[in-house]
C-alpha cells in the first residue's frame, strides 16, 4: 500500500473555529494554504457556486505560492473557473445536483492519481 500526503482544509475543527472567531472567514482556507502549500503542490477546490470568497482566496493563495489548482464547480459563475488551471464544471444549477455530479468526478480523479503515481 502506498500513499500521498493530503490535507483536508475542513477537517481541523480547532483551526476552523479559531479562524472563524479571530480572522475573517473569507481567509479561512487561504491561511491554511499559505501554511501548508509549497510550489508544485495541488489544491483541489470544490464550490457549487464558483463564487465562495473563502474558496476563491484559497485558490489565489495557491497560485501565488506556485501551486496547481483544480476546481470542481457549477457552470454559472466564472470566478473559480478563471482562477484554476483545470475546471470541471457541472452543467447543473441546483447545488445538490452539482454535488451529485462531483461525487464520481473526485473518485475518478483519485483513481487517476493513484494510477499515475503507483501503477
List PLM regions with ranges.
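Glycine-rich phosphate-binding loops that contact phosphosugars or nucleotide phosphates
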Residues: 1-119
Amino acid at each position: 500500500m502506498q500513499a500521498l500526503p493530503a490535507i483536508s482544509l475542513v477537517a481541523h475543527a480547532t483551526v476552523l473555529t479559531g479562524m472563524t472567531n479571530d480572522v475573517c472567514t473569507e481567509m479561512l482556507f487561504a491561511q491554511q494554504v499559505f501554511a501548508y502549500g509549497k510550489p508544485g503542490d495541488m489544491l483541489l477546490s470544490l464550490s457549487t457556486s464558483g463564487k465562495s470568497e473563502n474558496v476563491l482566496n484559497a485558490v489565489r493563495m495557491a497560485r501565488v505560492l506556485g501551486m496547481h489548482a483544480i476546481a470542481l464547480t457549477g457552470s454559472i459563475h466564472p470566478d473559480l473557473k478563471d482562477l484554476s488551471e483545470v475546471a470541471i464544471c457541472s452543467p447543473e444549477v441546483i447545488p445538490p445536483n452539482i454535488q451529485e455530479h462531483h461525487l464520481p468526478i473526485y473518485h475518478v480523479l483519485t483513481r487517476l492519481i493513484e494510477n499515475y503515481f503507483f501503477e
